[in-house]
Amino acid sequence: MNKDETSKLKLLFAGSPAIALPSLEKIAEIAKTGRWILTGIITNPDKRKGRGGSVEPCEAGSRAALLAEEFTALGLKAPAILKFDTLKAEARAAVSELKPDLLVSFAYGRIFGPKFMSLFPLGGINVHPSLLPKYRGASPIQEAILRRDSVTGVSIQRIAAEMDTGDILSQAVIPLNGRETAASLSDIAAIKGAQLLIDVLAQFEKQPLPQGIPQQGEASYCTVLEKKSGLIDWNRSAPEIDAQIRACNPWPLAQTSHNGQTINIFEASLFSGNAPENGSPAVDANGSGNPYGGVLGIDKKSGILVQTGGGILAISLLQYQNRKILPWQAFLNGARDFIGSRLV
């Protein structure tokens, strides 16, 4: 599409983790046709990762570098790649030079202050993976899993002064089947959000500009996800622990301890059968039988059976810390004393 440069929608994209990539890709795809101008991509700064401590960009930072090469190869001006610890004077000056019309953000991880937002004549919009005002905050995907919701969704909101309180431009529902992990649901929300975003951005190409509607209903906020959020309390019910395992995959991973060694649990399910007849009764330090966290035995279809404070959980994929992730059968080959022991 041939347009005068001054009439094209000029976008600055802000995002960092993998969930932002489909939205970035969709915007870049359209910008390559000349319909929009992707002025820049702002991401979190590079960080040291892994045991070697090598400095690496975030997922959006890696893709931004490749996109810049692709734009150049097409004879187009490459989007500027911006990485700042804060959005203060230096960042504002860099963005101001790009003269963007609209800020588009998805999981950037920082608050946009009024001085920063004043750089965008059309303001800003944000992709948020929940049905706002439900689950405002940084971990709405994990929250929906932890709460065992039957539906969640994606919202496109105006960026407002207070976090996740902006007027709603569009929403889409995502049905849940109760087996999603944070990883799998992030993938679904990423695709759904990108599709929704492009439809909303098209509305900014014409007058009147979309205004959105105020958020309706009671607001709720996400639990702050921390490393310790993965620690399993076997006194809780099997459905609660199952949801915790799924919500903590891929981070921080659900964890328990066996004979002083940390175990990461990747997959589990609710067990509706009877306790195994060939299992060994687990004992705690006081000698009482079958405590919570007791490893009761196995079910050939479901995995390793563990007693919880409400029901039995079947573990199917797990690992000792820093060792190979294994299906339950292979795991037990290297843990002969596991059945009849207790997880804490």
Question: Across the structure, where does each feature detected by a protein language model lie?
Answer:
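One-carbon transfer enzymes
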Residues: 1-252, 320-322, 327, 332, ...
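An anion-binding loop in the catalytic cleft
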Residues: 2-4, 235-344
